[in-house]
């Protein structure tokens, strides 16, 4: 506006009436998005919206579900320094070139094996992106490969070759590579004829699989110069950072060898890990075009490293998952004559063979409609390949490959009759399939890749009169359980059908729950394949349907089936979706098959040692096996990690300390100040603000190091909300804190985890009575260090604060490697000031916050040669703030990190004098 409202001496300046409507709508802007198929679509957003709002609009427009692979690239960027729309930043701060603006929808992350993409839509977008990059010369391609690629692109677009339609020269208007000629198009037309019968999706998959072998596949290039001012290109890919001179790779730095990545002004640094023979750190430096391009390169390196480390799941980890989740007993020495059933849903086999001799009486396949959205099969599945289906061999050591032919809509039931003997013997497998039968024989009885645990017996029970099987759970399965019960049973099989172990440590229970009027079942889950942990019930709301159904759902129950669907290969969010989808069925009933640990009386335990395995030692009076020494405690921890008992102990520890009141957090005026309604501070340890409104969701957490006269003080708090930033900075001011530790990014997986409560340098920001200025920002691959100047606007006093933000934690689960995290914790320790508290927060202020407090406490104990009992540390934290260290995966991660610090000597012992 050219004029403003001003009150001068009671008079108001005149305003042009044409300006008034602009005042109301000036924040709404138009963004033009160029899609990969050439379509341009406009979207309306406000300048105050974050980039995530626009990203969500684009994803919803395309119907994309695997959103993490894509992004929006700025149109005005040079190819020398690509820049992407940031999800957590406001649009007005990113698109400063005026409106309407133009952005390009592109693939951001190219995974090494696109065959693992789950959705056909994602593969199609990969295809379009690769085709465009080759066509425009961004992805260089040898001529012979370009001909083959173009032929698959033609098959995808035109379908099968038809001589009556496709006359010579029918590709004259098509464009595949720069500087193509008629000879090139003639070769493409000739090769097109050979692809007859390929579907569009299959042709595109063939295209992708050839394109991924190209030298620059998935490489994001940034222009730079070496220290002699010679031009080069820095490429970022899934495996690390490469340096190119005249498009020839001269150096490559794998992520595993990179200690950290940093920049200062327009200099970019790669810090490599020291080799055994080296005495000092090796640093590689480059000159970028300017500060902005240097920061773009650093940011892209961090995002690529974080993305591909989170995606990486080692084969041995997958084996651990299958071992952890496979149903059955660990005891293979006892003889079992009972029949028992295992169910295969969606093509995944549960215990298809026994470690010992096991004969399979019959297998029957029954097609059932899927009540949940099916998962698109991988390209590797033989049923998607073109003319490469191999004959199925009769050997049962190929049983895993046979199972890939099962479609997602088939429910397969295996009925085994086990006869376990001490010695191994051959077993025969007969498979009844329609329309033909095949005989399978097993020569390798171990079948370790098919089964990890052996089932022993089943104690099922019959259906009660009038009861019915849940949706997706076949009645024949329940009947089979009924028939094999020893001596029959009067229990209701629709309620209790069990896969009991010989030692009775767990069994399966079928639970039916009908939602309440609001459509809620009343329980929370944690875990999932993305979190590398089984799905476990973490909380039951009192008087909810889950609490009042018979049999009732219990905390700690492991979810096995949801309405007959195997969920062992699904992520946490997918499982939540399946549960919500059950409300849309005719019965609205949720049928859960859960694994529950059996409760044994004390008389059932043969020894005190066996009793101690059930109840954690740290919960009873401490009596460590290795004595009260650091070495003994580490031996005990290592043994517990190998056996899995540390996780059992952790799950049995109370989440909230009994008897501690939580009242102030639940007052009406304070409810909207809590990010999560169930993560609240105790009254006795909450942080009180100065003034009338004294509430903030924050707790004092003091960790005493015994025999060292040392107390590490923390303030654990949630990530600030937009309307609680003033209270957050008031805590910093009241406590005169000099260090803030942030353990999350602003958004993760499209969800806001924390409001940005600090300004970008050199901007300033006002919160309440405080003026915050970010004076500097130093970035590495794992964390960002900022220096803040906080000024009290009433008194003019100033206070300097260091802000550390850890950015290497993956969006879900825990890091695969603890190196970056341990380096970060050491840096935090180096900045700690005497007895001053350190303010630590993540999103809720309990999970990653608890991991950091546990790790620093363990390091302090290690350097003083004192024993470390992680469960004791967690209990002490939970006595001061509920639910510290939120998940089993976090607890396992920090336990493994503690053991690594001890075994590798990453913390030096202090001189006892």
From Swiss-Prot:
The gene is PTPN3. It catalyses: O-phospho-L-tyrosyl-[protein] + H2O = L-tyrosyl-[protein] + phosphate. Belongs to the protein-tyrosine phosphatase family. Non-receptor class subfamily. SMART domains: B41, FERM_C, PDZ, PTPc, PTPc_motif. The keyword Electron transport does not apply. Residues 422-453 have a biased composition (Polar residues). One of its GO terms (biological process) is regulation of sodium ion transmembrane transport. It is an enzyme of class 3 (hydrolase). This is Tyrosine-protein phosphatase non-receptor type 3. It is a peripheral membrane protein. It comes from Homo sapiens. Residues 382-393 have a biased composition (Basic residues). Residues 646-901 form the Tyrosine-protein phosphatase domain. InterPro entries: Band_41_domain, FERM/acyl-CoA-bd_prot_sf, FERM_2, FERM_central, FERM_CS, FERM_domain, FERM_N, FERM_PH-like_C. The active site is at 842 (phosphocysteine intermediate). PANTHER family: TYROSINE-PROTEIN PHOSPHATASE, TYROSINE-PROTEIN PHOSPHATASE NON-RECEPTOR TYPE 3. GO terms for molecular function: ATPase binding; cytoskeletal protein binding; phosphotyrosine residue binding; protein tyrosine phosphatase activity; sodium channel regulator activity. It is found in: Cell membrane; Cytoplasm, Cytoskeleton. Pfam families: FERM_C, FERM_M, FERM_N, PDZ, Y_phosphatase. Keywords: Cell membrane, Cytoplasm, Cytoskeleton, Hydrolase, Membrane, Phosphoprotein, Protein phosphatase. Gene3D superfamilies: 1.20.80.10, 2.30.42.10, Phosphatidylinositol 3-kinase Catalytic Subunit, Chain A, domain 1, Pleckstrin-homology domain (PH domain)/Phosphotyrosine-binding domain (PTB), Protein tyrosine phosphatase superfamily. The modification Phosphothreonine is found at residue 376. Residues 454-470 have a biased composition (Low complexity). Substrate binds at residues 811, 842-848, 886. Residues 363-400, 420-475 are annotated as: Disordered. Residues 510-582 form the PDZ domain.
């Amino acid at each position: 506006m050219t004029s403003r409202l001003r009150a001068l001496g009671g008079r108001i300046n005149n305003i042009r009436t044409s300006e008034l409507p602009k005042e109301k709508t000036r924040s709404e802007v138009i963004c033009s998005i160029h899609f990969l198929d050439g379509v341009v679509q406009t979207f309306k957003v406000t300048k105050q919206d974050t980039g995530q709002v626009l990203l969500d609009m684009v994803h919803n427009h395309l119907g994309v579900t695997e959103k993490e692979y894509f992004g929006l690239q700025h149109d005005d960027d040079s190819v020398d320094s690509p820049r992407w729309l940031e999800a957590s930043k406001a649009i007005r701060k990113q698109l400063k070139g005026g409106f309407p603006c133009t952005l390009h929808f592109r693939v951001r992350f190219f995974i090494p094996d696109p065959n693992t993409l789950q959705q056909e839509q994602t593969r199609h977008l990969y295809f379009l992106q690769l085709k465009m990059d080759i066509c425009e010369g961004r992805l260089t391609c040898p001529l012979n490969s370009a001909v083959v690629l173009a032929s698959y692109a033609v098959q995808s677009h035109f379908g099968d070759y038809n001589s009556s339609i496709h006359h010579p020269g029918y590709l004259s208007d098509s464009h595949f590579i720069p500087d193509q000629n008629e000879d090139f198009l003639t070769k493409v037309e000739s090769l097109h004829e050979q692809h007859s019968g390929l579907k569009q999706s299959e042709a595109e998959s063939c295209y992708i699989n050839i394109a991924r072998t190209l030298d620059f596949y998935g490489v994001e290039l940034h222009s730079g110069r070496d220290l002699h001012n010679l031009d080069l290109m820095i490429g970022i890919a899934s495996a690390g950072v490469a340096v190119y001179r005249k498009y020839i790779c001269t150096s490559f730095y794998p992520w595993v060898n990179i200690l950290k990545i940093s920049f200062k002004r327009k200099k970019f640094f790669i810090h490599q890990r020291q080799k055994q023979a080296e005495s000092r750190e090796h640093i590689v430096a480059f000159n970028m075009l300017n500060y902005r391009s240097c920061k773009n390169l650093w940011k892209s390196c961090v995002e690529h490293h974080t993305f591909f480390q989170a995606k990486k799941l080692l084969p041995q980890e997958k084996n651990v998952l299958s071992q952890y989740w496979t149903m059955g007993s660990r005891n293979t020495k006892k003889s079992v004559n009972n029949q028992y059933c295992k169910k295969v849903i969606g093509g995944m086999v549960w215990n298809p063979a026994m470690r010992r001799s096991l004969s399979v009486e019959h297998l029957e396949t029954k097609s059932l409609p899927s009540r949940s959205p099916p998962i698109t099969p991988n390209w590797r599945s033989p049923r998607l390949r073109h003319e490469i289906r191999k004959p199925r061999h009769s050997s049962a050591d190929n049983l895993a490959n046979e199972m890939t032919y099962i479609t997602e809509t088939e429910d397969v039931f295996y009925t085994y009759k086990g006869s376990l003997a001490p010695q191994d013997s051959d077993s025969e497998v007969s498979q009844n399939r329609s329309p033909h039968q095949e005989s399978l024989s097993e020569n390798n009885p171990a079948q370790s890749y098919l089964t990890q645990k052996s089932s022993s017996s089943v104690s099922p029970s019959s259906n009660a009169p009038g009861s019915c099987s849940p949706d997706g759970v076949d009645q024949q399965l329940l009947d089979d359980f009924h028939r094999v019960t020893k001596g029959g049973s009067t229990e209701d099989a629709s309620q209790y059908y069990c896969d009991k172990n010989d030692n009775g440590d767990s069994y399966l229970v079928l639970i039916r729950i009908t939602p309440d009027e609001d459509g809620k079942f009343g329980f929370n889950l944690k875990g999932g394949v993305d979190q590398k942990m089984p799905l476990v019930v973490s909380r039951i709301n009192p008087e909810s349907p889950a609490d009042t159904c018979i049999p009732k759902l219990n905390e700690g129950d492991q979810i096995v089936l949801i309405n007959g669907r195997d969920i062992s290969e699904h992520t946490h969010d997918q499982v939540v979706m399946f549960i919500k989808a059950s409300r849309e069925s005719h019965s609205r009933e949720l049928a859960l098959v859960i694994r529950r640990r059996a409760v044994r009386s004390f008389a059932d335990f043969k020894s005190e040692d066996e009793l101690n395995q059930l109840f954690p030692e740290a919960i009873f009076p401490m009596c460590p096996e290795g004595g009260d020494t650091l070495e003994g405690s580490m031996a005990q921890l290592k043994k517990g990690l190998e056996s899995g008992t540390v996780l059992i102990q952790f799950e049995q520890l109370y989440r909230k300390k009994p008897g501690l009141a939580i009242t102030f957090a639940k007052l009406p005026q304070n409810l909207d100040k809590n990010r999560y309604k169930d993560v609240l501070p105790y009254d006795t340890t909450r942080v009180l603000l100065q003034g009338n409104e004294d509430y903030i969701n924050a707790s004092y957490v003091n960790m005493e190091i015994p025999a060292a006269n040392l107390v590490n003080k923390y303030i654990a708090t949630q990530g600030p909300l937009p309307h609680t930033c003033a209270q957050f900075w008031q805590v910093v001011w009241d406590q005169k804190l000099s260090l803030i530790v942030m353990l999350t990014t602003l958004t993760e997986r499209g969800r806001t985890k924390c409001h940005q409560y600090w300004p970008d340098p050199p901007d300033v920001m006002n919160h309440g009575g405080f003026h915050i200025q970010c004076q500097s920002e130093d970035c590495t691959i794992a964390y960002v260090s900022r220096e803040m100047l906080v000024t009290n606007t009433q008194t003019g006093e100033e206070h300097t604060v260091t802000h550390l933000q850890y950015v290497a934690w993956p969006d879900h689960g825990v890091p695969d490697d603890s190196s970056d995290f341990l380096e970060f914790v050491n840096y935090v320790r180096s900045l700690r000031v005497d007895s001053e508290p350190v303010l630590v927060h993540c999103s809720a202020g309990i999970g990653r916050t608890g991991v950091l407090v546990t790790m620093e406490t363990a390091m302090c104990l290690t350097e003083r040669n004192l024993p470390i009992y992680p469960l004791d540390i967690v209990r002490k934290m939970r006595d001061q703030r509920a639910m510290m260290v939120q998940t089993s995966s976090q607890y396992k991660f920090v336990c493994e990190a503690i053991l690594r610090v001890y075994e590798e000597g990453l913390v030096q012992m202090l001189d006892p004098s």
